[in-house]
Design a protein with these regions (language model features):
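N-terminal "domain-start" segment that seeds a small globular fold
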Residues: 22-49
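Short active-site neighborhood of thiol/selenol oxidoreductases, capturing the structured segment around
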Residues: 47-70, 90
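Thiol/disulfide oxidoreductase modules built on the thioredoxin-like
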Residues: 107-113, 120-164
Length: 167
């Protein structure tokens, strides 16, 4: 092979590697700091993760047409109520359509115990690497560190409470 061809291949591979590497965001894992975010609730209030520093935060990435998400809702409510103010639950809804769908859904299902946050363009979900189906659940400790991640619904209230007690 001529030197020119080898040099062209090296430059092409380097350029492609650089382009691909620049477009890849790091998906946070257990032990990482939770990505910061601010979203507007269906009531119009801006809610930031940093608002809850010092508390345990359970973030649920969900969707208006996710049946598995609905099945875990009573477990979330029970764990929240038993935590005595030490636990915050945030329902973040994947959105690619009109955010009023979230309001209509939450109202019809009476899921009003904790903030419902439409995630327009899935910006926050993408920063966490969250899936649309099944739900993706993150538990963040009082220092803002991801302590637990689960893809799929919780199977019981006790499951949630045991995880929270473990840290």
């Amino acid at each position: 092979m001529s030197e020119k061809i080898v040099m062209a291949l090296v430059v092409a591979i380097f350029g492609l590697t650089t382009i691909v590497g620049c477009g890849t965001a790091k998906i946070p894992q257990v032990g990482d700091k939770a990505p910061a975010f601010t979203l507007q609730s269906i009531e119009g209030k801006n809610i930031s993760l940093s608002d809850f520093q010092g508390k345990i935060v359970l973030i649920v990435f969900t969707s208006v047409n996710c049946k598995e998400c609905e099945t875990q809702m009573p477990y979330l409510v029970g764990a929240y109520e038993n935590a005595g103010g030490k636990l915050v639950v945030l329902d973040i809804y994947h959105m690619i359509y009109d955010p009023r769908l979230v309001q209509d859904y939450v109202t019809s299902k009476q899921f009003t115990t904790f903030p419902s946050l439409p995630d327009l363009n899935n910006t926050v979900a993408n920063s966490y690497g969250a899936t649309r189906y099944p739900p993706t659940n993150f538990i963040i400790d009082a220092t803002g560190t991801i302590k637990y991640k689960k893809i799929g619904p919780f199977q019981s209230q006790q499951e949630i409470e045991d995880i929270i007690k473990s840290f």
